[in-house]
A protein has these predicted regions:
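Juxtamembrane intracellular "pre-TM" segments in multi-pass secondary transporters
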Residues: 2-15, 201-229
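Intracellular juxtamembrane helix-capping segments at the cytosolic ends
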Residues: 41, 129-142, 334-348
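Central cavity-lining transmembrane alpha-helices of secondary-active solute carriers
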Residues: 58-79, 268-283
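Glycine-rich segments within core transmembrane alpha-helices of 12-TM secondary carriers
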Residues: 67-69, 148-170, 361-372
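Helix-to-loop junctions at the C-terminal end of transmembrane segments
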Residues: 71-86, 280-293, 379
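A membrane-interface helix-boundary motif in multi-pass transporters
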Residues: 88, 171-186, 259-260, 377-397
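Structural signature of the two symmetry-related core transmembrane helices
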Residues: 89-105, 296-311
Length: 411
């Protein structure tokens, strides 16, 4: 039964059924790209070029991120202007979910630099055609007094995807083909129920004019500060995601008695950090609705991420990396969850929510370009010493955390 057939609360709040399916769809969207970035693509780069894996990974990530930025902005503009029986967002969400599954197969089959680049480009286009319109649903459909609660559940998507990557892919499964297949199947299974069962009436009452490509929303001071904060923190996140496995292989001293490999240690670190992020992210989202003080919670999350990245520099001997990733994960869960609600409130115009969130998404995709370049520059400057990459990560997280406190429209 379509979720909108469930009686609606009189205050305009979204229903429990809507929230449940939307949360599952968000988890599916994050499962689409978190395992790809932190495990599948690094392992594929290693399989294609063992000796040059870090450089190859950086090259592929930069090109893919450029494509992702344009694709997400295009998806936002296109879905803002889409009209029809399926509404503005649903056609793009459903079609993108199926395409993401197919492009996982392309990445797996790639056997060289150019085929891997082509596969990642196709993957990023499919991902962002799904992800941009899905993110716009929060601004379209959820009233302000529920944004923190829905964001608390939506914020579970990132750490849950990390848990999927750590437990299912890194620990439970051993073959690269199995890892790609399970991920490809999980995405449409989680995303399509929302796209198929929840009617989209977000275009009701909006002007018939179609939004255009524009970066004009960056002239809004509060939006610009939220963008800057997310941009800086995402550089920190991307550096941690990209180089954690290589850090465990080449820098960390793992417990010799346990016989742990870098991949299994990666799985356990991701699991520990994810569990911390799940708990604190959920609590933070609920508190941000009840207190309506989102900025200080976002700032606290960014500061904790900076502390965690700093511990990676200072304590490479076990259990230092474990403690570092727990602290980083707690900060990431808190920051990412509450920041979702903060950004949804900062948007100046509902009719162009998809486009403006596409602009905001540049704060995620630009770091996917910048972070590999920064990481590569640091590695070249410091003789391949990975600990300096995490030192830079700590600086970006801290500055990004402080930036959010200048926002005025949201407390």
């Amino acid at each position: 039964m379509p979720v909108d057939h469930i009686p609606k609360p009189s205050d305009g709040a979204v229903t429990g059924g809507f929230i449940a399916l939307y949360t599952l769809a968000q988890i599916g969207a994050f499962v689409a790209f978190i395992p790809m970035l932190n495990l599948l693509l690094p392992l594929k780069a290693e399989a294609v070029d063992l000796s040059g894996k870090a450089v190859l990974l950086s090259q592929v990530m930069v090109i893919g991120a450029v494509v992702a930025g344009f694709a997400n902005l295009a998806a936002g503009v296109l879905s803002d202007g889409t009209r029809g029986p399926w509404g503005r967002r649903r056609p793009w969400i459903a079609g993108g979910a199926v395409a993401v599954a197919a492009t996982h197969g392309l990445v797996y089959l790639a056997d060289g630099l150019w085929s891997l680049i082509a596969a990642v480009v196709a993957f990023q286009i499919a991902l962002n055609l799904m992800f941009g319109p899905l993110n716009a649903v929060l601004a379209d459909r959820v009233p302000d007094h529920q944004k923190g609660t829905v964001s608390a559940l939506q914020g579970l998507a990132l750490p849950t995807a990390g848990l999927f990557s750590a437990v299912v892919l890194a620990i439970a499964l051993g073959g690269l083909a199995e890892r790609f297949l399970i991920t490809a199947l999980a995405v449409p299974l989680l995303v399509l129920p929302f796209a198929l069962l929840v009617p989209d009436h977000s275009e009701a009452g909006l002007p018939a004019t179609r939004p255009r490509f524009s970066l004009g929303v960056l002239t809004d001071r509060d939006f610009r500060l939220a963008f800057t904060s997310r941009l800086l923190v995402q550089v920190s996140i991307t550096l941690n995601v990209l180089y954690l496995l290589f850090y465990l292989q080449d820098v960390a001293t793992l417990p010799s008695a346990s016989g742990a490999t870098a991949e299994t240690a990666f799985g356990w670190l991701m699991t520990a950090g994810t569990l911390g992020g799940l708990i604190f992210g959920f609590i933070g989202g609920i508190l941000s609705d009840r207190t309506r003080r989102r900025r200080v919670l976002v700032m606290s999350g960014g500061v904790l991420m900076a502390v965690g990245a700093g511990l990676m520099v200072a304590q490479p001997v076990w259990p230092g990396p474990l403690l570092a990733q727990i602290v980083f994960g707690i900060g990431l869960g808190l920051y990412s969850t509450v920041d979702i609600a903060l950004v949804a409130e900062v948007l100046p115009d509902r009719s162009s929510a998809g486009r403006d969130l596409g602009v905001m998404n540049l704060a995620i995709t630009v770091p996917q370009i910048a972070a590999p370049l920064i990481g590569l520059g640091v590695l070249l400057a410091f003789g391949g010493e990975l600990r300096w990459v995490f030192a830079i990560s700590a600086v970006f997280a801290f500055v990004g955390a402080i930036a959010v406190m200048g926002i005025r429209r949201v407390r």
